[in-house]
């Protein structure tokens, strides 16, 4: 079971399009990227999530061209679900990945 943030982020990145379809449902696929307004799932096109790794960078990373914000899919889960505590973010990521939840 993944215990640390980087392992969860890697597992989410392998499922980047499914993560985007679930948590960023107001967006859409555009080639190798998922575009949406922002990490809170606002409609628009200023945020891009890289769906697969490429010479430009690893899959699962995103940048919002309007604000300069960037991050990984754990940040998407945090923002789109309105979560504050990392433990809750990790539990939601594990739920999405169908992994056992962490101990409190």
Task: Outline where the language-model segments fall.
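N-terminal structured subdomain of primase-like DNA metabolism proteins
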Residues: 1-104
């Amino acid at each position: 079971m993944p215990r640390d943030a980087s392992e969860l982020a890697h597992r989410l990145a392998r499922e980047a399009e499914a993560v985007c379809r679930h948590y960023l449902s107001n967006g859409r696929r555009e080639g190798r990227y998922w575009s949406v307004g922002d990490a809170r799932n606002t409609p628009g096109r200023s945020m891009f999530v890289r769906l697969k790794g490429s010479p430009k960078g690893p899959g699962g990373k995103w940048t919002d061209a309007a604000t300069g914000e960037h991050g990984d899919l754990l940040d998407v889960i945090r923002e789109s679900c309105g979560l504050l505590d990392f433990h809750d973010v990790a539990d939601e990521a594990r739920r999405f990945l169908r992994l056992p939840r962490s101990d409190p």
